[in-house]
Amino acid sequence: MKRKALSCAVMAVIAGTMVAPVLPAVAEEIEEVAVTGVRGKPRSVSDSPVPVDVFGSEALESVSYTDTNDVLKTLVPSYNVTRQPISDGGTFIRPAQLRGMPTDKTLVLVNSKRRHRAALVQIGGSGTQGPDIATIPSSALKSVEVLRDGAAAQYGSDAIAGVINFILKDNAEGGSFSVRT
């Protein structure tokens, strides 16, 4: 009986030392998540998690070219336009390329709405094509937004190379006339 009492006392002492100390409560850090959408409010370039270039009318007018393709080739490093050989109607259509990908992988928007593709489908022998950017006059542009990263999750498979959004001037009256020499 004495042994049982002694062993119970020893067990109580050991169990008392094995009690975990009470730790102060640690504040849980909450990770900030940015959610963006097509119909959300406009955001500035510095708030964007992806590479977005925004060119205002001053930047567009400062380039010495008047063709929209040439203006974008000057301002956007990953923008390219290739001329087709003189053999058929493909000579007259110059769709945009971003990041060296095919022309149908660059989404072109005008005032945030999809631009229709060119009617000629045989460009470069691939059977696919993108919109002809040369049909958008540079004098009608208010600004150009270029997303130089894949946006297929947001816009679909035609935005794998990136997205170009042309914002047109919203003048309801009047017009403009410019001469470059």
Model-predicted regions and their roles:
Residues 113-148:
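Short acidic/polar hinge/loop motifs at secondary-structure boundaries
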Residues 32-63, 69, 90, 119-125, ...:
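N-terminal periplasmic "start-of-domain" segments of outer-membrane beta-barrel proteins
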Residues 70-71, 75, 96, 132-134, ...:
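N-terminal periplasmic accessory domains that precede
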Residues 29-31, 48-53, 92-94, 102-106, ...:
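Envelope-exposed proteins and targeting segments
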Residues 73-117:
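Extracytoplasmic beta-strand/coil segments of soluble accessory domains associated
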Residues 52, 60, 72, 144, ...:
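Non-catalytic regulatory/gating segments with a bias toward low-complexity or hydrophobic composition
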